[in-house]
């Protein structure tokens, strides 16, 4: 690949919000049964994004479910959680944000063989990729070497969001790590970039393509979906955010959905809870993870309850 193309793809990666890759594409409703399973039953703890965590005789801690966006309304909504962080001893995050993330993501999102996206998807889908990709400033030949999941990442946020990121405007999640770094607060990552990329690259390619086929034909639709997501977050409904993604992956078979749940939601929730438990027992910590992790029978909050912690919504 020519050096100019590599440079352009590095810019593409830098314009993306990495965590959105999981939040808007693959985080789905925590169920392993077919979609007929009771929605209300599966979405316990879905009515708030900020929760107080108590128990084990430790000082209280908090967990904040975010929408990782640079939209000013979203960042401003985190003001109270920012205050909690300034008085905390620990900040726990799903993944540490640093420059190494971009290069590692770049290394796995492109095909390194002779496969090309144009040959994998339908002509109709690739036409949508070309048309919408142009709105982000990318040419068809650039999009053509992306793996299906990576192409989906590009379109998981609208051009307005990508433009803000390219200008250096910080996302909500990044603001927490900025504050922690400024004040010398210990940052505890709950997962590594390598773990997340391994999961992404192992996804069934046919399922990746099926999700990519649902790409809207017009950029206005992408913007509209994103605004709905913002509104759901501002209404503090992690359950509504959860439902959004359930609707998106409903194009997959129940078996494929169950596999996605286990690898991309359930297993990650269990892993994060096991890694945050030590700091929670010490107390006075703030955990910041995507809001879609919070609700459901196998959500982070229910898993913490099962370990003896008391959770209380903070409105």
Language-model features: locations:
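Short secondary-structure boundary/capping elements
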Residues: 45, 76, 267-271
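Bacterial N-terminal signal peptides that target proteins for export
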Residues: 6-25
């Amino acid at each position: 690949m020519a050096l100019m193309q590599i440079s352009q793809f590095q810019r593409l990666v830098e314009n993306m919000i990495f965590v959105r890759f999981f939040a808007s594409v693959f985080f789905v409703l925590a169920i392993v049964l077919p979609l007929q399973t009771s929605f209300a039953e599966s979405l316990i703890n879905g009515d708030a994004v900020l929760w107080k965590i108590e128990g084990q005789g430790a000082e209280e801690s908090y967990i904040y479910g975010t929408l990782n966006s640079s939209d000013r309304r979203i960042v401003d909504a985190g003001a109270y959680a920012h205050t909690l962080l300034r008085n905390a001893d620990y900040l726990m995050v799903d993944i540490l944000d640093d420059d190494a993330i971009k290069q590692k993501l770049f290394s796995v999102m492109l095909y390194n063989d002779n496969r090309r996206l144009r040959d994998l998807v339908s002509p109709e889908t690739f036409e949508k990729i070309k048309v919408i990709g142009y709105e982000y400033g990318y040419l068809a030949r650039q999009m053509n070497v992306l793996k299906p999941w990576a192409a989906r990442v590009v379109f998981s946020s609208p051009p307005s969001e990508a433009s803000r990121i390219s200008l250096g405007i910080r996302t909500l999640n990044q603001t927490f790590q900025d504050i922690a770094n400024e004040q010398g607060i210990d940052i505890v990552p709950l997962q590594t970039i390598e773990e997340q990329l391994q999961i992404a690259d192992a996804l069934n390619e046919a399922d990746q393509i099926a999700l990519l086929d649902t790409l809207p034909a017009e950029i206005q639709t992408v913007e509209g979906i994103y605004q709905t997501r913002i509104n759901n977050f501002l209404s503090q409904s992690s359950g509504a955010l959860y439902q959004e993604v359930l609707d998106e992956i409903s194009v997959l078979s129940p078996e494929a959905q169950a596999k996605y749940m286990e690898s991309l939601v359930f297993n990650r929730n269990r892993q994060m809870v096991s890694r945050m438990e030590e700091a929670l027992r010490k107390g006075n910590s703030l955990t910041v993870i995507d809001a879609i992790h919070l609700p459901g029978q196998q959500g982070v909050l229910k898993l913490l309850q099962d370990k003896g912690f008391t959770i209380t919504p903070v409105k």
